Structure formats: C-alpha cells, structure tokens
Amino acid sequence: MTILHMDIETLRNYCINKKGVTEELPFGPDTLVFKVMGKIFALAGLDAIPLSVNLKCDPEKVISLREEYENNILPGYHMNKQHWNTVVLNGHLNPNFIFQLVDDSYNLVEAGLTKKQQQELKDLDE
C-alpha cells in the first residue's frame, strides 16, 4: 500500500502498533500523546491545520533537518527546541520519511529508559 498523504489515523496506527506504546490526551482533547513505557515520544496537535506532530530528535540532527526541510520541519512547538522538532504533515514529506522520524523518536526515548523499564519493554515480546 502506498501512502501519499499522512493523516491522523495513519500516524496513530503506526505509533500505537509500536511495542509498549500507549496513547493519552493528558493536555486536553486537542493533543494526542504517544508514550513508550510512560515516556512521551510523539505529540500530535489534533486541531492543527495542517496536521503536525512533535517528535524527539537527536540534537546533532535537529538543525540540519530543519534546514533541509524548511517549512516542513520546525523547532518543536512548546518543547525543548534542542531535542524536539515539529513535523508538518502537509503532503510535502514522504510518509516513509515521517515513519523513520517516528522510529527515531521512539528509539531515542527507548534508549533513555531505565534498565528496569528497558527489560519490561523487552519482556512484552515474551
């Protein structure tokens, strides 16, 4: 299946199917939050037009992504701008690239979990 445009359901399905992920609305009905083992890795503004998602990013890549994808990858809205980007889902970015950014965010957060949390996450497979 080829996806040409990212919508909230596609983004949600991709995020929620990752291991150990829960979804919540802790900041009100307009911000969908995805967590791995209780730690945020993605926030989607449901009232944003166009749809956007905040994703954690390697600090060494954060600026270069913003420069390369100007107007589509921005400093993280209401987030630590050294570690978070806002990715605008307006059809200008390849969905597979967006999925890779989601994966990168998930992996960064997973790597920052305590050893106990990492083991609990690993045990979810068994």
What is the meaning of each model-derived region?
Residues M1-E126:
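Charge-dense, helix-prone N-terminal extensions
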